[in-house]
Amino acid sequence: MSTASINSCLTISPAQASLKKPTRPVAFARLSNSSSSTSVPSLIRNEPVFAAPTPIINPILREEMAKESYEQAIAALEKLLSEKGELGPIAAARVDQITAELQSSDGSKPFDPVEHMKAGFIHFKTEKYEKNPALYGELSKGQSPKFMVFACSDSRVCPSHVLNFQPGEAFVVRNIANMVPAYDKTRYSGVGAAIEYAVLHLKVENIVVIGHSACGGIKGLMSLPADGSESTAFIEDWVKIGLPAKAKVQGEHVDKCFADQCTACEKEAVNVSLGNLLTYPFVREGLVKKTLALKGGHYDFVNGGFELWGLEFGLSPSLSV
């Protein structure tokens, strides 16, 4: 397997790679504006990773509630609140705190989520939908996207905004730390269904896995305790998909600080996901037939940078453009 150059306006250099030892990205684009000074977003919080709060509902009761019907769950919750009268003042105080936080400094009204969504849709309809009748007319007939994109659920890294994808251009899957698990028909059927639909039915030509800076999921992966203990119901088990990336980074970057190791793992975890894509038979078939290409990317929203690298599988040598 060789690292292929990306046929785009990016600066390209040839490189060789293997799934066991992925190389550094071979394409780089700096998306910065020297005329503006962009500060680091104030919402980035440096808090403990996967720190589970003390549960109001004990783990055994939580598991039992997960198996209940909607009506049973409501009844159980009402019973819990009636038995734990001390929760009332706590809940009221928390509501007051949230309300105070949502008040802006100029004393305007609290944030209204319904009004926010209504205003957002009105803007979309008047500024985009009604101004592009040809586009949305075609989309009403079906979709034929060129890209399938795996991106993180992080609210700061929407791929449609970052890469300016228009409606109908990208079939997007978002999850914690933009992970792609290996083929598993029972454990990760949701991801498998998305890949199968994109490759076999939508006939996408590119699958792109995009990591990003300051990823909490990757920080959590790098912080997993060595004894295997867990404090969450789902998150830690999910990010363990990237354990090969963690092991590689800790082995090759032992002299680096934790923050730099996390940055390296953000990119290495993308390579692990690209490798996992090869465990899907229809992905391998697409690569052999050259109807499908795999690409990895990393979006640095702190510095305004984007790296892109490609993988090509076959007998032909890689090319540089």
Curated annotation (Swiss-Prot):
Gene Ontology MF terms: carbonate dehydratase activity; zinc ion binding
GO biological process: carbon utilization
Primary location class: plastid
EC number of this enzyme: 4.2.1.1
Matches recorded under SMART domains: Pro_CA
Location of the protein in the cell: Plastid, Chloroplast stroma
Keywords attached to this entry: Chloroplast, Lyase, Plastid, Transit peptide, Zinc
Catalysed transformations (reactions): hydrogencarbonate + H(+) = CO2 + H2O
Gene3D superfamilies: Carbonic anhydrase
Top-level EC class as recorded in UniProt: lyase
Transit peptide, UniProt annotation: 1-100
Keyword Nucleotide-binding: no
GO cellular component: chloroplast stroma
Presence of the UniProt keyword Plastid in the record: yes
InterPro entries per the UniProt record, alphabetical: Beta_CA_cladeB, Carbonic_anhydrase, Carbonic_anhydrase_CS, Carbonic_anhydrase_sf
Task performed by this protein: Reversible hydration of carbon dioxide.
Subunit structure: Homohexamer.
PANTHER family xrefs: BETA CARBONIC ANHYDRASE 2, CHLOROPLASTIC, CARBONIC ANHYDRASE
Entry's family note: Belongs to the beta-class carbonic anhydrase family.
Descriptive protein name: Carbonic anhydrase, chloroplastic
Native source species: Nicotiana tabacum (Common tobacco)
